[in-house]
Amino acid sequence: MSTEKTNQSWGGRFSEPVDAFVARFTASVDFDKRLYRHDIMGSIAHATMLAQVGVLSDAERDTIIDGLKTIQGEIEAGNFDWRVDLEDVHMNIEARLTDRIGITGKKLHTGRSRNDQVATDIRLWLRDEIDLILGEITRLQQGLLEQAEREAETIMPGFTHLQTAQPVTFGHHLLAWFEMLSRDYERLVDCRKRTNRMPLGSAALAGTTYPIDRELTCKLLGFEAVAGNSLDGVSDRDFAIEFCAAASVAMMHLSRFSEELVLWTSAQFQFIDLPDRFCTGSSIMPQKKNPDVPELVRGKSGRVFGALTGLLTLMKGQPLAYNKDNQEDKEPLFDAADTLRDSLRAFADMIPAIKPKHAIMREAALRGFSTATDLADYLVRRGLPFRDCHEIVGHAVKYGVDTGKDLAEMSLDELRQFSDQIEQDVFAVLTLEGSVNARDHIGGTAPAQVRAAVVRGKALLASR
């Protein structure tokens, strides 16, 4: 055990001061100090309420609020001395307040515990973070809409199993990511509703004997409602878990998008070019231009998945109410929010700058018999059962593989080997343009539908 000792503000019950190493081990100020603004916001609302119900005088309230605002200025100017021996952001600010204004500072904590204080701080912080993240999602979606509108007629191969499947437009492909991000946006908006509940007033676990006005504090802090049960108020971290779950889904989407960008920029695909400002080089290979931004986003998804798993594991064995375990909720939550926000920002900056290589995309779509399904549909319209058509086209594809010809490159006589229902008009069906234009329905890849989807997307963003 360390022989160095330190004293805590709650030491009245103890016969010896806490061991210095234990003090450092249990302190959270190194990471929870980022809650300072929300801690001060909550304290100002709490002081205002205490004055309203007569626990503080108006003069005491004003002195406390002025002191808290001064402390916020000190922190933001980098002039605040964060002390590990004071454990956390709450006690550091309270101690500094008492240093500045004297005994009145000690009255601020009346009717409040650090248990409901920290639960309130985290909710205030996460509410703001969600708003920032929603803004980045919208910015990324705007970039996708702009690209999709420009590339409504650009044809590329669509894939299943990473094998050529059917022709699609690049605009249509980009709008798939728009749809995923719309769901991410909705999940986070929904999560924000449950985050925006105020635990302040729950005190340690059972509430307080003081005549507090929780509705007033709730209104001052912009919460939608108060937590309905004091035990749950200080114990609940569902909102943090729910956020990390929504963030995990969003990062999974960005990771899949990243994988496609990495593939598309490779020499083997060459579908797109990323501007140099989003890439790095190699220390040994002079020719390299590495897509580091999407690669890092793909890798960082694991951090957010880990945060979700960590929080679930953290909470699963805890009895009510607050336990010291919950100190470990902040770092994974902070990291998940930072990672998602930064990843979205990188993508929102990068996506509008992507340069598709139209000729290469088109050439790739011409390989792999991408219009085979169109030929089968053509035969269905001639009255044949689809399963028979499927087999007929399969034989035609095998012939194409053996002869090195795509379906559109075969002569009419060659095609008629497989069905006498095939006529000259089949070649309009077998073109890339014919294929994509034929899928002219809501959600289809036809250029007209891409443009219509862009209009709907713009209306959605404008409604937020």
From Swiss-Prot:
Its EC number is 4.3.2.1. Pathway: Amino-acid biosynthesis; L-arginine biosynthesis; L-arginine from L-ornithine and carbamoyl phosphate: step 3/3. GO terms for biological process: arginine biosynthetic process via ornithine; L-arginine biosynthetic process. Keywords: Amino-acid biosynthesis, Arginine biosynthesis, Cytoplasm, Lyase. Gene3D superfamilies: Fumarase/aspartase (C-terminal domain) (1.10.40.30), Fumarase/aspartase (Central domain) (1.20.200.10), Fumarase/aspartase (N-terminal domain) (1.10.275.10). It catalyses: 2-(N(omega)-L-arginino)succinate = fumarate + L-arginine. InterPro entries: Arg_succ_lyase_C (IPR029419), Argininosuccinate_lyase (IPR009049), Fumarase/histidase_N (IPR024083), Fumarate_lyase_CS (IPR020557), Fumarate_lyase_fam (IPR000362), Fumarate_lyase_N (IPR022761), L-Aspartase-like (IPR008948). One of its GO terms (molecular function) is argininosuccinate lyase activity. The keyword Iron does not apply. Signal peptide: none annotated. One of its GO terms (cellular component) is cytosol. The keyword Cytoplasm applies. It is found in: Cytoplasm. Belongs to the lyase 1 family. Argininosuccinate lyase subfamily. This is Argininosuccinate lyase.
